Design a protein with these regions (language model features):
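Cytochrome P450 heme-thiolate monooxygenase catalytic core
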Residues: 1-7, 15, 30, 71-78, ...
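Cytochrome P450 I-helix active-site segment
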Residues: 5-15, 115, 119, 216-223, ...
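Cytochrome P450 catalytic-core helices
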Residues: 255-274, 278-280, 392-407
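Conserved cytochrome P450 K-helix/beta-meander segment immediately N-terminal to the heme-binding cysteine loop
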Residues: 342-369
Length: 446
């Protein structure tokens, strides 16, 4: 029997509902909803009713019904104004037309070049640390993720080509994100966003023209997008190349930086597991050797730690869809116009799926335990046809950072109160201050 809509979570305020709590501490909101009502409950964001779902079965429906009864784009209009019509902000037709270009960017053969870029930039960062000192890993990972993206997508001359102000313009765009306010209001942050977009467009348009004039000199993201036919047989116009570049940077660099910082923090907080990681690195990573695909494939404990970090501290802890046609979820009929959200705060902590779910235990992903077999149990990289195209890129980047950092340095975690900072985009991490000492005989390049 189909019942009425799911029950409402407590704590809503007149007019605004749960909006403030959603923006400031959605983890507490979602966990309270689950405690009160189980795996299906309703919150109100202003006048907008939102169904929040928990568990792999409901997550599977969420992802498989996307582009059918669930619309992906309407929930991200604030992002569309910031980065343009690309990836999850694009219309269904545009997304499927662009998809061959996105697949080309992240195909397996290109991962070899990306891994090379990651090795170079990670080692440059490690060399810059000197023999000993202290570093805020959270900020360092933001800077490093920018450098990796620049070298991987633009090439070795990325610093000169992008210019010193590129990332400042990007930060102005990221700071403008606001899922509440209409994105075209004449506010200072939206004006700064629009000015930054113009400057970035000018920079990238010049790079595109250089590659049009001398295609033989380049083999990077832009040349890939200039030469890869779309589904309809056409080639991307320049404005769409700029948009895709911005979309990839936006979707990847902040989320990867946050996950990488949490990964290092969690390993330092759990020295017994860190010892397993260090032993694995010592066995499989030769001093002064670049990590290639063969080497990375042997770092099981590192990748299990990455998966456990995604479970416990996801940068993307929720995603949203709009109900276009009435849909039955469990015993409820969800009307058109509602929104639906997945919740890492609850799905990732189900005791029937993950043993001792609050504990950092990467070994849960080992084959003999197999807690990560259901692809819809964890939502950190999305799911279904829209699953993050750059997932392997991000995981490899985190693995290379982890392997080289702990290979070359003895470390001590100084920060004691490391917290998730929830924002209007990806979740961030508070300061992760680490004291380090270069190991005797550790390679130092340059």
């Amino acid at each position: 029997m189909v019942a009425a809509v799911p029950p409402m979570v407590s704590g809503g305020l007149p007019v605004i509902g749960h909006l403030v709590e959603m923006l400031q501490n959605r983890e507490t909101l979602f966990k309270r909803g689950y405690a009160e009502h189980g795996d299906l409950f309703t919150i109100k964001l202003g006048p907008q009713p939102v169904l929040v779902i928990t568990g792999a079965d409901h997550n599977r429906q969420f992802y498989t019904e996307t582009d059918k009864s669930l619309n992906m784009q309407d929930g991200y209009t604030f992002l569309k104004e910031a980065i343009g019509e690309v990836l999850f902000t694009a219309s269904q037709e545009t997304y499927y037309n662009q998809r061959p270009a996105l697949q080309e960017v992240f195909k397996r053969e290109r991962m070899v070049d990306y891994a090379r870029a990651m090795n170079i930039e990670v080692q440059r960062w490690l060399d810059s640390l000197g023999q000993s000192g202290e570093v805020d890993i959270a900020q360092a990972m933001m800077d490093l993720a920018q450098a990796v993206a620049g070298r991987a997508f633009i090439g070795p001359d990325y610093e000169a080509e992008l210019g010193a102000g590129f990332w400042k313009q990007y930060e102005a765009i990221a700071a403008s994100l606001d899922p509440v306010l209409p994105p075209k209001l004449p506010l200072p942050k939206f004006r700064r966003r629009d000015q930054a977009k113009k400057k970035i467009n000018a920079t990238l348009s010049a790079l595109i023209q250089k590659r049009r004039d001398h295609p033989e000199r380049y083999n990077d993201l832009i040349t890939t997008l200039l030469t890869t036919p779309l589904k309809d047989g056409t080639i991307l116009p320049d404005k769409d190349i700029v948009t895709i570049f911005m979309g990839l940077i936006f979707a990847g660099h902040e989320t990867t930086a946050g996950q990488a910082a949490w990964l290092i923090a969690l390993l330092l907080q759990h020295p017994d597991y860190l010892r397993l990681v260090q032993e694995e690195i010592a066995r499989h990573v030769q001093p002064a050797a670049a990590l290639d695909g063969s080497m990375l494939s042997r770092l099981e404990h590192v990748y299990w730690a990455i998966d456990e970090t995604t479970r416990l501290r996801p940068s993307a802890d929720t995603q949203i869809r709009t109900v276009e046609e009435p849909i039955q979820v469990g015993s409820y009929e969800i009307p058109a116009g509602w929104r639906v959200m997945v919740s890492g705060a609850t799905s990732h902590h189900l005791s029937e799926v993950f043993s001792d779910p609050e504990r950092f235990n990467p070994l849960r992903f080992a084959p003999e335990q197999g807690e990560g077999k259901n692809p819809f149990a964890i939502i950190g990289f999305g799911g279904g046809i829209h699953k993050c195209s750059g997932m392997n890129f991000a995981k490899n980047e985190m693995a290379i950072i982890t392997a080289l950092f702990f290979q070359q340095f003895d470390t001590e975690l100084l920060s004691r109160d490391i917290r998730v900072i929830m924002g209007k985009g990806a979740n961030r991490v508070s300061e992760v201050r680490v004291r380090y000492q270069r190991k005797a005989g550790a390679p130092r390049v340059g």
